[in-house]
Amino acid sequence: MSSSNSSSAVRSSAKHAAERIQQHLPPNSNHAVSLSSSSLNLPARTSIVAPGIAHSSRLKDRPSASSSSSSSSVSASSPSTRRSGTPVRRSQSKDFDDDNDPGRVRVSVRVRPRNGEELISDADFADLVELQPEIKRLKLRKNNWNSESYKFDEVFTDTASQKRVYEGVAKPVVEGVLSGYNGTIMAYGQTGTGKTYTVGKIGKDDAAERGIMVRALEDILLNASSASISVEISYLQLYMETIQDLLAPEKNNISINEDAKTGEVSVPGATVVNIQDLDHFLQVLQVGETNRHAANTKMNTESSRSHAILTVYVRRAMNEKTEKAKPESLGDKAIPRVRKSKLLIVDLAGSERINKSGTDGHMIEEAKFINLSLTSLGKCINALAEGSSHIPTRDSKLTRLLRDSFGGSARTSLIITIGPSARYHAETTSTIMFGQRAMKIVNMVKLKEEFDYESLCRKLETQVDHLTAEVERQNKLRNSEKHELEKRLRECENSFAEAEKNAVTRSKFLEKENTRLELSMKELLKDLQLQKDQCDLMHDKAIQLEMKLKNTKQQQLENSAYEAKLADTSQVYEKKIAELVQRVEDEQARSTNAEHQLTEMKNILSKQQKSIHEQEKGNYQYQRELAETTHTYESKIAELQKKLEGENARSNAAEDQLRQMKRLISDRQVISQENEEANELKIKLEELSQMYESTVDELQTVKLDYDDLLQQKEKLGEEVRDMKERLLLEEKQRKQMESELSKLKKNLRESENVVEEKRYMKEDLSKGSAESGAQTGSQRSQGLKKSLSGQRATMARLCEEVGIQKILQLIKSEDLEVQIQAVKVVANLAAEEANQVKIVEEGGVEALLMLVQSSQNSTILRVASGAIANLAMNEKSQDLIMNKGGAQLLAKMVTKTDDPQTLRMVAGALANLCGNEKFLKLLKEEEGIKGLLTMAQSGNIDIIAQVARGMANFAKCETREIMQGRRKGRSLLLEEGVLEWLTSNSHIDSASTQRHIELALCHLAQNEENANDFKRTGSVTEIVRISVESSRDDIRSLAKKILKTNPYFSS
């Protein structure tokens, strides 16, 4: 059993690998791989494991796409591929030729996926129905050989989205309602098949979950954005043949009215709400859903106990533009027209059998009324389908409400919901036949368009009121204007008389003023002439002043240029004076130096003493003259130049004498220097000879180095040639590995084909054993054995042709695709016990652990973890995994990935390691137990199942050691808080997980050292409950034995 749990994900990974390989096959290839959810199914091993990993939690009346065993791809495999001696008979149902008739009732079918209970109970049986959505057909199995085929307008698998269902079923009806036609959308089917989910799901948290009601109103409100369309709704339920208002629960037992002339059905007492937007509708719909009757049954946790009818009234004005253009016209063309349409969305309560649904008490009465109304509806459908003259619509209030939907003037779309389980064969057949009969009904679709006299009346009344008010306003305005004009006329007459008097007076005054102004104007002309003459004179003076101003500016420019030149000249003179002063100071310094030198040579230069005194006197006189002539630049410069020349002549003479003396002294110094230089040359010559010798030595060293370099060059050339040969060899090896990889893929496809054939043989075996007896079962078991032997032969041939060592080498490839395919093959091989030893001997465990530690690819992590889980079933592999730190590495995987499939594989591997007594303490030290508890926090039912299995294995091994006397003290699990976790999860829905938790609690309770912890956590009550309610006899017996023998529990 543990082998099937640990290797199921490996089979899934191998399936995906084969699909990936098949994508690269040419389009016309004959090697197509047939895959299903049971590909690569290998023999199971016995251990404490979870019986299934691919469980799906069942939500309230909701189709789920997570269950692979209930997908249509499995059940849609062609029966012709299965080997059977009995031919398969298929009976075709009549195809409907009037698909384009807009009045025909459109019928669609939707299949609910298997729930968790059906996955366990129906695991060995094929699906009851087989869907063919491409050709819009459904096959219903009668038995293993016979099936009936039915055609529908739409066929939806269990993976179909809510949006796709709405667009296929309801959207054409909604569009017709917007165009003015009545419409009906209805869901019919057995209880628990997803009617309320399909029609009435609100989808508050997830918009993708919204049902037909919400999506239909969303489309209608989107088109009703203009003011010409109004949308109103009413929401009723038919509960036990009583019509109740879901929007006003106090309204009970509302009556139904029928118009004798038109035959229209109405419910006048229902609450009608004007819908503004989608949020408003969702609030109203939530109120109605809250008031609807529901109950918990065996087949559905929230089973609807009433028929819900949502009625949407759409009113649309047709000539809005004409009314705006001619608001006052009263002709026939001005009468507004309106289109009234009505949409019924009906969520029927599910038909059910009391013995299967487990109803009792008041729910039996509810079921009677539900079945009664549905029976009446079925009778009406039968009568309409058969063309009967009498339609029994008055047998039930439901048929009266739906009178216009079947055989009336509405466009009707029916969706029937069915389940995949064979336990409800009769209910599924009845539902399908109901849909087939409904497809024969053709309604007379009519467009309801009428004159809107009410709107016209209101508009005319508004116009009359407006015109009356306008006439009164005009009369008042006319009277007020008349009084105002009379008043203004009187004022004008008075003002005219006064103006006439003022005009006569003013004319006399103006004549006098005119005479005075003429005289003053003549005087002003004279003054103007005088000012003109003065202006000409001033103009001439201005011209003269301008000329003077130009001359003045020119003189100023010349003066400024002169001043600039003067300033430059003065600066030049000052620089020259400063230079002469500096030269005089330099001469004084030189003279003083000469004095010092002459005093030292008195015997030789005695004749120069007088000249030196005269020079000092001349210098004194020169300085005095220089001070006197500071204000006269030119004279002072000339005198200074003369004195300077004389002083230079004298100083030159003195310098000549000094040079002669120095020359004598320098001759002696030159001789001594030549001696010194000769000595230095000798020393340098010796150094040069030494340098020559060292140079010769270095030259020899360089020659030796050069020879070494030549040898190294030859060696490097040889290494380069060797590297080229190695590269060529590696290229050949790479090509060889690629060819081996292609062989590996080919063998993998053959293996999968064999496994697929084995699955078909297994299904046929299970069916044949139930119907054909022992003889047919034995024949098919022999075929199954042959298929299994063929599979083992294929795996053996795969190992022999390619070799496990080469496959493990491909795991280290840099090509990610090659690496993924290689690890999938290793995982597939690891599921076979014969290959596990070879993988361990070839270093497969080290390679997989290294891959898990270093890789970041989710696919590699998932498949490698599955391979490790398979290898962990082998004792030798367990030793190697623990010695290489595999437990700690697996425990840390919870921080590396959150993929539930990967974590399930890791939990399965740790659970297998928990079954070895040698590693209990080491698993705790390397945080293996803590890692399992951390993985259980994900909430995934499959991961929790593996964690529970691991705890049961650990507790079982501890109990065995304690009974054999090899261990004492509290359980290691209690130190990690496992007891609290087991207690809190002991009521989990999964039967296998609950069994493992019960086993773990019983094994822990056998150790008396754990008694205080059981009392502290309240787990004793769980032991008591297990002794009474456990589904396994052996577990109940063990719990009772513990309660009797343990004094701490009995007290």
Curated annotation (Swiss-Prot):
Record field: compositional bias (Basic and acidic residues): 753-766
PROSITE patterns given in the database record: ARM_REPEAT, KINESIN_MOTOR_1, KINESIN_MOTOR_2
SUPFAM superfamilies listed in its UniProt record: ARM repeat, P-loop containing nucleoside triphosphate hydrolases
Biased composition (Polar residues): 772-788
Location of the motif D-BOX: 411-419
Signal peptide: none
Cysteine disulfide links: none
Location in the cell: Cytoplasm, Cytoskeleton; Cytoplasm, Cytoskeleton, Spindle; Cytoplasm, Cytoskeleton, Phragmoplast
Complex formation: Interacts (via C-terminus) with NEK5.
Domain notes: D-BOX motif functions as a recognition motif for the ubiquitination machinery.
General function of this protein: Acts as a plus-end microtubule-dependent motor protein. Involved in the control of root hair tip growth by promoting microtubule depolymerization and limiting the accumulation of endoplasmic microtubules. In vitro, binds to polymerized actin through ARM repeats, and to polymerized tubulin through N-terminal motor domain.
Record-given protein name: Kinesin-like protein KIN-UC
Record gene name: KINUC
